[in-house]
Each structure stands twice: as C-alpha cells, then as structure tokens.
C-alpha cells in the first residue's frame, strides 16, 4: 500500500497531478483544491502523504500535504455514503481543524457548502463525525471562549501577521482576543484590529 510519494510534477490535469519519482515511476495523485492550487510548475518538487483506495476496476491515490489531513480523509471514507471523491471534496472545502470546529460549534449546515451534499446527507455525515473525529486535536490557539474556533479567518490572519514580521507567540493571543470580541470579522478586518492591538502593546 503506497503511503508516501515524493518526486517532480510531470502533469496537472483536473484535480490530479502526475508525480514522477527518482526511479522514473509516475503516479497520478488526486489532491484537495487548496493543495492543487499551490502546486509548483512542471518539474517542481512535491511530496504527499498518500492514501491508496482500491476499487474493483481501479486503484487510485489521494495525496495530502499533512498526515493529519490524510487521517481525516480516512475517517471520512469510513462514513456510509461518503466515498473517496466525496471525502476529497469535503477536504477541498474544509481543513481538518475546520471540520473539528464544525463539530465543536454544532454547525451541520456548513457541510452543505460542499458540492453534492444536501441537508440530509450533511446531517448523516455530521452525526458520524461527532463520534469519529478527534475534537481534542483542535489546537488550543484556535479555540475561543465557549468552545468556538475561528478556523480559516484565524489561520489566514495569523499568516498575514507572520508575513508582517510578528512572531506567532506574540500575534496568536492578540488575534484570539480580537476574534473573541468580534467573531464576525473577515480576514482583512481581523488583521486591521490585531495590528491596532499589537501597536498599542508595543
């Protein structure tokens, strides 16, 4: 069973890329949208944690940038009515910590943002995730008072602060307080508010 692939990008087609190893073997690897969007040009080096899915008529590889994402994919595929393609679509919309946040917040309808998932299917998947997804793995820095997590806004705003030269240990607590006070902020708003707070603290 193939669990890891490293090599250069030979082709990109649809939601997959062909990775050619040093030994000259090419593997077609299906990827989440956010990973696909960050692929280097042809010839660039890549490495993926891989899950091999075997069907009667095909053997498919699904690649992920982190081991956590691969394990979350495996959890999703154990849910009835969720095949590998649906699991990949879910992980194209939500990172593992985003899914944990949905469980913490009891946000069932968020799953309907995934193409092909209606309200009834979302409820079924959500009930399974409650029992199968390790919510305790949600980083403490991503959890607000009352258990809610800022998810993508927190992550993207924190990355923006890092690009501006702020250390994570300095920026994360301030950003957490900003989102605790104003949970509806978008990334730009969270950045502006955090920068003001950081400027006052210096």
From Swiss-Prot:
Residues of the region (Domain II) are: 66-144
Locations listed in the record = Cytoplasm
Region annotation Flexible linker: where it falls in the sequence: 145-155
Among Gene3D superfamilies, the record links this protein to: 5' to 3' exonuclease, C-terminal subdomain, DNA helicase RuvA subunit, C-terminal domain, Nucleic acid-binding proteins
What Pfam families does this protein map onto? HHH_5, RuvA_C, RuvA_N
The highest taxon in the source lineage is: Bacteria
UniProt-listed CDD domains: UBA_RuvA_C (cd14332)
Q: Which UniProt keywords apply?
A: Cytoplasm, DNA damage, DNA recombination, DNA repair, DNA-binding
Annotated region Domain I: the residues are 1-65
GO terms of biological process kind: DNA recombination; DNA repair
Q: Where is this region: Domain III?
A: 155-202
Q: Which GO terms describe its cellular component?
A: cytoplasm; Holliday junction helicase complex; Holliday junction resolvase complex
Gene Ontology molecular functions: ATP binding; four-way junction DNA binding; four-way junction helicase activity
Instruction: Reproduce the free-text note on domains from the UniProt record.
Output: Has three domains with a flexible linker between the domains II and III and assumes an 'L' shape. Domain III is highly mobile and contacts RuvB.
Which HAMAP family does its entry note?
DNA_HJ_migration_RuvA
Oligomer status and interactors:
Homotetramer. Forms an RuvA(8)-RuvB(12)-Holliday junction (HJ) complex. HJ DNA is sandwiched between 2 RuvA tetramers; dsDNA enters through RuvA and exits via RuvB. An RuvB hexamer assembles on each DNA strand where it exits the tetramer. Each RuvB hexamer is contacted by two RuvA subunits (via domain III) on 2 adjacent RuvB subunits; this complex drives branch migration. In the full resolvosome a probable DNA-RuvA(4)-RuvB(12)-RuvC(2) complex forms which resolves the HJ.
Sum up the protein's function in the record's words. The RuvA-RuvB-RuvC complex processes Holliday junction (HJ) DNA during genetic recombination and DNA repair, while the RuvA-RuvB complex plays an important role in the rescue of blocked DNA replication forks via replication fork reversal (RFR). RuvA specifically binds to HJ cruciform DNA, conferring on it an open structure. The RuvB hexamer acts as an ATP-dependent pump, pulling dsDNA into and through the RuvAB complex. HJ branch migration allows RuvC to scan DNA until it finds its consensus sequence, where it cleaves and resolves the cruciform DNA.
Q: Which family does it belong to?
A: Belongs to the RuvA family.
Q: What is the protein named?
A: Holliday junction branch migration complex subunit RuvA
Per the UniProt record, the source organism is Nitratidesulfovibrio vulgaris (strain DSM 19637 / Miyazaki F)
């Amino acid at each position: 069973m193939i669990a890891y692939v490293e090599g250069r990008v030979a082709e990109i087609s649809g939601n997959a890329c062909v990775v050619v190893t040093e030994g000259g073997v090419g593997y077609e690897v299906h990827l989440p949208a956010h990973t696909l969007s960050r692929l280097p040009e042809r010839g660039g080096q890549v490495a993926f944690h891989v899950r091999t899915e075997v069907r009667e008529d095909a053997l498919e590889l699904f690649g992920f940038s982190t081991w956590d994402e691969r394990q979350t994919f495996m959890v999703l595929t154990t849910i009835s009515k969720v095949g590998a393609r649906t699991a990949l679509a879910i992980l194209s919309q939500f990172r593992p910590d985003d899914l944990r946040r949905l469980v913490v917040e009891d946000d069932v309808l968020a799953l309907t943002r995934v193409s092909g998932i209606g309200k009834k299917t979302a409820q079924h998947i959500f009930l399974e995730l409650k029992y199968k997804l390790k919510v305790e793995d949600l980083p403490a820095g991503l959890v607000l008072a009352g258990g809610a997590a800022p998810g993508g806004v927190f992550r993207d705003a924190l990355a923006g602060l890092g690009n501006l030269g702020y250390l994570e240990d300095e920026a994360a607590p301030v950003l957490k307080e900003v989102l605790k006070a104003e949970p509806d902020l978008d990334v730009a708003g969270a950045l502006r508010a955090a920068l003001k707070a950081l400027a006052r603290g210096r």
